[in-house]
Design a protein with these regions (language model features):
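Flexible, glycine-rich active-site loops centered on histidine and acidic residues
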Residues: 53-96
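Short beta-strand segments
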Residues: 4, 35, 60-66, 107, ...
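Claisen-condensing/thiolase-fold acyl-transfer catalytic domains that form or cleave C-C bonds
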Residues: 7-9, 26, 34-53, 153, ...
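A glycine- and small-aliphatic-rich helix-loop capping segment at beta-alpha/alpha-beta transitions
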Residues: 15-26, 49-54, 75-86, 196, ...
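Glycine/charged-rich beta-loop-alpha catalytic/anionic-binding loops adjacent to active sites
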Residues: 2, 21-34, 83-90, 139-140, ...
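Condensing-enzyme catalytic core mediating Claisen C-C bond formation in acyl metabolism
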Residues: 81-154, 158
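Short, well-ordered, mixed-charge alpha-helical segments that flank or form enzyme active sites
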Residues: 9-12, 40-43, 68-73, 127-130
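Short coil/turn connectors at secondary-structure junctions
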Residues: 26-30, 54-60, 92-93, 101-102, ...
Length: 239
C-alpha cells in the first residue's frame, strides 16, 4: 500500500499507516507514503509495477486524497490584505487553481489478472534546478507561474521524447491522453508542443482544478466511465 498524497493530516503517523488500519489490511502488507508533488501517483505505479515484476509482491494498491480547502482559505484571506503588493498577489494566484479529490488503483500481475488493462511502464526525467519555482506549505503556496510553465513544458518535451523511444510511440499511437491538468493554457500548450490532438484529452480542470497527484487517476477513471477508453486502446498517462 502506497499513499501518494500531498495533503496529510499529521506529520506522524504516515497517511498510509492510517489507511492500512482503516482497511484492516494484513500486518504483512507493507505500507508507506511516497511524496513527489504531482508526479507521486505515477511514481508509485512504477514502484508497485517493479516490485510485482521482481516477484516481491503479488499486488499493490496506491491511494491519494487531496483537500485544498485550508490553503485556499488562507490564501484568500492573505489576498484581501490591502497592503499586498502586485508581485505577492501574482505569486499567490496559482494557489486558487487547486482542487480537491481522491483516487485509488490496484495493480497486479498479468498471471493473476490476464484480462485487465496492462501497465507498460514509462520514462522519467528531472529538472531539479527549477525546484524553487513552486514552494508550498499548509498555509501558503508561492509560484512563479510564468517560469514554471516555460521550464515545465521544456521538461515535458524531453520526457515525452524519451518515453516515445522507450515504448515505441509514434504520432498516432495513443488513443487517449490522460494529462495532469493545471489550466487551459497549460493543457493547450502541452498538446501543441508534443504534437498531440487535444480532442484525445478529457479535460477536468474546468470543474476539478489542479488535484495534484490525484489528477491523472481521476482523469483516467472519468475517461473510462465516459466510454473514451476501450479494450485494446493505448492510453498515455502524462504527469
Amino acid at each position: 500500500l502506497i499513499n501518494s498524497s500531498v495533503c496529510r493530516d499529521y506529520i506522524e503517523p504516515s497517511t498510509a499507516c492510517i489507511v492500512h488500519g482503516n482497511l484492516q489490511l494484513d500486518p504483512r502488507c507493507l505500507n508507506f507514503d511516497m511524496g513527489n508533488a504531482c508526479l507521486a501517483f505515477i511514481n508509485a505505479m512504477d514502484v508497485v509495477s517493479g516490485m510485482i515484476g521482481q516477484g516481491r509482491i503479488k499486488m499493490g494498491m496506491i491511494v491519494d486524497g487531496e483537500s485544498s480547502r485550508h490553503v485556499l482559505n488562507a490564501t484568500l484571506n492573505r489576498m484581501k490584505d490591502p497592503n499586498l503588493t502586485d508581485a505577492e498577489f501574482r505569486e499567490n494566484f496559482a494557489t486558487l487553481t487547486l482542487g480537491s479529490g481522491s483516487a485509488a488503483i490496484i495493480l497486479g500481475s498479468t498471471r493473476d489478472f490476464p484480462d485487465a488493462p496492462r501497465y507498460r511502464g514509462g520514462a522519467h526525467l528531472a529538472a531539479t534546478q527549477h525546484s524553487q519555482l513552486c514552494l508550498g506549505t499548509e498555509e501558503k503556496m508561492k509560484t512563479d507561474t510564468k517560469k514554471l510553465l516555460i521550464h515545465g513544458l521544456e521538461l515535458a518535451g524531453q520526457t515525452y521524447a524519451k518515453a516515445s523511444e522507450a515504448l515505441g510511440w509514434g504520432p498516432n499511437t495513443l488513443d487517449e491522453l490522460v494529462l495532469h491538468q493545471v489550466s487551459k493554457v497549460h493543457t493547450d500548450q502541452l498538446c501543441n508542443l508534443l504534437g498531440l490532438d487535444t480532442e484525445k484529452a478529457l479535460k477536468i480542470y474546468p470543474t476539478h482544478g489542479n488535484v495534484g497527484p490525484a489528477s491523472v487517476p481521476i482523469v483516467l477513471s472519468k475517461a473510462v466511465e465516459a466510454g473514451r477508453v476501450q479494450k485494446g486502446h493505448r492510453v498515455g498517462l502524462l504527469g
